[in-house]
């Protein structure tokens, strides 16, 4: 269900940007509000899904003491998504391509992964470190200086 809302959010994000360009309307406040909505849809939503999975995952015995607080590590994704969106708003180089992983791609990755492989990811205790590394890697990809393909349409 959460994945469907992320997909719906991605569709609305695409169409609101396209309609603003077609109607030639933009404002600084609109740009910031769009980024805020994007952070909720593509940052907080996937982080909440990851949080829920981290709460029920099998933990290795060495990390069992971390069970009460470790699920909150999921919100690193939301923080890095907000940072990525802030960088995007200020970076003039991202007119034809993206620099760093776009937040919708990251959200769709996490939503798809946790929707389709939830049992596989939560049951073996050795998967917890894998998921934590994936959180770090995807967060880094959001803000790294790596050029990425973009589906951007010119007016």
Positions of PLM-derived features:
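Functional transmembrane alpha-helices
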Residues: 1, 37-43
């Amino acid at each position: 269900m959460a994945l469907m809302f992320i997909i719906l959010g991605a569709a609305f994000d695409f169409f609101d940007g396209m309609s603003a360009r077609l109607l030639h309307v933009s404002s600084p406040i609109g740009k910031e509000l769009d980024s805020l909505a994007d952070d909720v849809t593509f940052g907080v939503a996937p982080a909440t899904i990851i949080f829920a999975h981290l709460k029920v995952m099998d933990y290795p015995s060495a990390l069992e003491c971390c069970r009460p607080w470790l699920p909150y590590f999921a919100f690193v994704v939301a923080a890095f998504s907000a940072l990525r969106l802030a960088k995007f708003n200020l970076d003039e180089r991202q007119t034809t391509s993206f620099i760093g992983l776009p937040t919708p791609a990251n959200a769709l990755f996490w939503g798809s992964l946790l929707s389709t492989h939830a049992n596989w990811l939560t049951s073996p205790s050795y998967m917890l470190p894998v998921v934590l590394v994936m959180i770090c890697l995807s967060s880094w990809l959001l803000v790294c200086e790596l050029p990425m393909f973009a589906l951007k349409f010119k007016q």
